[in-house]
């Protein structure tokens, strides 16, 4: 043990020494990294204690507010909002209690409480993640994984200003329309209203007002219905829409009898249209809510309720994994050009006919493309970390595009002799030409992108070996996919008769441009700032997604060849460890070996 008397001489002796004490903390941590490591480890604990004191009310307070009965009633109310009647009744019987009825409350209180808790927890979680041994990429990956899971559980949905307002109590000012004059039946007119007149088009509105317009007692806007059902998930969940339709159906007492009947019929028609055209929106939870709603409708409208029930039955069949309806073609399927060595383990690009490669590339990509659902194309889901789980097929298409582009560049760069490289380049140009003939603009653009990688584009002597005919073909293909005039030539070709596989990148760019424009219109209602949904934007989104839907329904009359598809699906097996940028850099280094800078033709093999 060191006593004060023994310590003083040491301090005195140390003080007389000339020691540089500037940056002492930095120097100590540098020479003793274990101290720094310890500080990093305990930092989140210290911070968590402070946050815990702020956000944790203590066991006694929690117990007073959340006893066993309160928790059971929260669960019962949650089951009620989700339409799970049988489960709710069983729990009521077992717990010997009833579900609390709260007027005007359609949101699950349990979910609301969990969301609020998560908001507070996020502060501790993010702070803790910031001070761990995870790399930046690992940390982001874990945060993304957590957020995607919570989004799938509907626990991180944005709050909706309409949540606490019953549709029948919504202020009349919360909708802004515009008169549009039309002289003939067009997309803004229903068949009921095709006389020369002014149409009222919704520009901005609250969710309640949008649903009210959707189910108006006297006006039937067919185009509005189509646009709404395709785009509603950009501002509302399916469960919320179902809840709002139920609110709208339950007209207040004293409401005009004829208007009430018309509104209720409109609600039923919306339900049927929703089920018939957007069955993929319905998970088990939403189906349970719909069945409960149908039971209510059955009392007053047995025939319409039966029609919705039939649609629901068909929908369940469509959602079944065993359902795989086949398209019947009028023309005979062309015979595939199968190489003699089709079963060889060493099958190469030179063994397969260029046209057959184009066919199989088209079948592979169209299978992904046809599965893209409208919600995947909303709110830039493919671009945003929190929403990527909602756009699996769009992300597959993007990944496939990158795979084909890198495959093209890799096959050319890996070919060591200049004449052989030119032969490989020629082969890809021929494949691209066949893709053009198949109206497969996505794979066509992927090959053009690969040929335009800087590592390939710089191969001057390789290009000089291409024939004049090949160069003309390549020039024509580039003109089709030229970005000039916002891809004017390509957009003109979209008028061709399907089957067709559009270049998805153009349409994702269009959707991004629309999404990044001002989202909502903020207006002053009764001295209160209210944010209204920009429905004009949804109309533009509808037009783009409609084009995609039109080309999804007409498949290619081609015969799949399993072995060739396996070959084309494995083209990127050795690239998985690289990002696109890393791989392009690696290819560029290889390209410099093939044709060094300032090299003469005689220097290149």
From Swiss-Prot:
Chief localisation class: membrane
Localisation: Cell membrane
Signal peptide span: none
SUPFAM superfamilies: Ras GEF
KO phenotype (gene knockout): Grows at a normal rate, but are severely impaired in both chemotaxis and activation of adenylyl cyclase, both of which are critical for the early stages of development. Unable to aggregate.
Keyword Ribosomal protein applies: no
Alphabetic keyword roster: Cell membrane, Guanine-nucleotide releasing factor, Membrane
GO CC term (a single one): Ras guanyl-nucleotide exchange factor complex
Subunit structure of this chain's protein: Component of the Sca1 complex composed of at least gefA, gefH, scaA, phr, and the protein phosphatase 2A subunits pppA and pho2B. Interacts directly with gefH.
Descriptive protein name: Ras guanine nucleotide exchange factor A
Organism: Dictyostelium discoideum (Social amoeba)
């Amino acid at each position: 043990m060191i006593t004060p008397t023994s310590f003083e001489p040491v301090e005195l002796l140390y003080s007389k020494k000339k020691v540089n004490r500037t940056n002492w903390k930095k120097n100590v941590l540098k020479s003793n990294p274990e101290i720094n490591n310890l500080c990093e480890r305990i930092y989140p604990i210290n911070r968590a204690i402070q946050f815990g004191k702020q956000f944790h009310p203590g066991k006694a307070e929690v117990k007073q507010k959340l006893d066993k009965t309160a928790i059971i009633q929260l669960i019962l109310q949650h089951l009620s909002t989700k339409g799970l009647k049988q489960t709710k009744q069983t729990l009521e019987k077992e717990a010997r209690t009833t579900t609390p009825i709260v007027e005007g409350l359609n949101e699950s209180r349990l979910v609301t409480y969990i969301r609020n808790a998560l908001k507070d927890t996020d502060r501790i979680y993010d702070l803790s993640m910031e001070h761990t041994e995870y790399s930046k990429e690992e940390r982001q990956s874990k945060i993304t994984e957590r957020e995607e899971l919570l989004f799938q559980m509907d626990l991180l949905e944005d709050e909706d200003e309409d949540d606490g307002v019953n549709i029948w109590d919504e202020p009349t000012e919360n909708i802004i329309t515009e008169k549009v004059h039309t002289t003939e039946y067009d997309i803004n007119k229903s068949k009921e209203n095709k006389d020369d007149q002014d149409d009222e088009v919704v520009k901005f509105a609250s969710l309640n007002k949008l649903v009210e317009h959707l189910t108006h007692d006297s006006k039937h806007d067919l185009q509005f219905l189509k646009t709404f059902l395709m785009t509603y998930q950009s501002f509302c969940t399916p469960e919320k829409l179902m809840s709002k339709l139920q609110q709208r159906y339950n007209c207040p007492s004293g409401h005009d009898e004829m208007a009430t009947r018309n509104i209720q019929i409109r609600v039923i028609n919306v339900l049927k249209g929703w089920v018939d055209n957007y069955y993929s929106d319905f998970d088990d939870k939403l189906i349970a809510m719909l069945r409960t709603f149908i039971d209510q409708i059955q009392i007053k409208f047995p025939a319409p309720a039966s029609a919705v029930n039939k649609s629901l039955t068909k929908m369940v069949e469509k959602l079944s994994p065993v359902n795989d309806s086949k398209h019947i073609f009028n023309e005979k399927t062309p015979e595939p050009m199968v190489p003699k060595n089709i079963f060889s383990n060493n099958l190469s690009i030179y063994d397969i006919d260029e046209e057959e490669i184009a066919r199989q590339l088209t079948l592979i990509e169209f299978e992904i493309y046809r599965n893209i659902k409208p919600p995947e194309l909303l709110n830039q889901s493919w671009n945003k970390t929190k929403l990527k789980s909602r756009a699996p097929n769009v992300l597959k298409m993007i990944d496939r595009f990158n795979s084909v582009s890198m495959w093209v560049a890799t096959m050319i760069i890996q070919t060591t002799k200049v004449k052989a490289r030119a032969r490989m380049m020629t082969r890809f140009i021929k494949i691209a030409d066949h893709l053009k003939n198949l109206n497969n603009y996505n794979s066509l653009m992927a090959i053009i992108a690969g040929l335009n990688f800087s590592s390939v584009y710089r191969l001057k002597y390789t290009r000089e070996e291409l024939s004049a005919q090949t160069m003309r073909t390549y020039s024509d293909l580039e003109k089709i996919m030229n970005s000039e005039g916002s891809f004017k030539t390509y957009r003109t070709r979209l008028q061709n008769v399907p089957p067709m596989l559009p270049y998805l990148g153009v349409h994702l760019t269009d959707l991004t441009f629309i999404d990044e424009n001002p989202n909502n219109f903020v207006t002053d209602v009764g001295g209160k700032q209210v944010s209204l949904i920009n429905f004009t934007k949804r109309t533009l989104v509808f037009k783009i997604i409609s084009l995609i839907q039109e080309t999804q329904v007409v498949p290619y009359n081609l015969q799949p060849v399993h072995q060739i598809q396996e070959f084309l699906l494995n083209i990127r097996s050795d690239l998985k460890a690289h990002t696109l940028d890393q791989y392009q850099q690696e290819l560029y280094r290889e390209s410099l070996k093939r044709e060094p800078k300032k090299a003469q033709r005689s220097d290149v093999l």
